[in-house]
Amino acid sequence: RSLVEERGRFLMIPSEEISAMAPEGPVHVNATNIKEVIFPLEGETAHAVLEANLRAVHEQAKRTGREILPHLNHPNFKYTFTAEILAAVTADKFFEVYNGHMSVNHLGDADHPSMERMWDIANTIRVADLHAPPLYGIATDDSHNYHGNPRAAPGRGWVMVRCRHLTPEKLI
């Protein structure tokens, strides 16, 4: 961290991909600005697993007094999630509308909507039927390799934030 972080110019924020399993498939939740590791929680459905892990993130935030940003990673990975589940889990405010990894199916297929279409469906349900706030989309590159395989390299998806102060408290 001391090699790259520069006050006011470059900031590293502690984060974790909480990786759990549900009967429908994998459930991955990112938690940004954590203080300590959050161990994955299981459940009987993808909906229940997502809610349990979001609850664990919110509990750490409350206990530590630290703002933590959770988001659902790559809902179309193994087609674990539907737009209806995304809409119903109103504790989640963010999800990956784009993930640059080659295996996450962000374009969907003949039987599953693309992430962009899923986002439209989920927000229509949230706003019109549940009277809940919309779900915001973010992008990540999901880097797994930093040298070699360009299909899992950095730089294919990111989030830019305009912020007066480069601190976790102001960004999150």
Locate the predicted segments by residue.
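Extended, charged catalytic domains and RNA/DNA-binding interfaces, predominantly
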Residues: 1-172
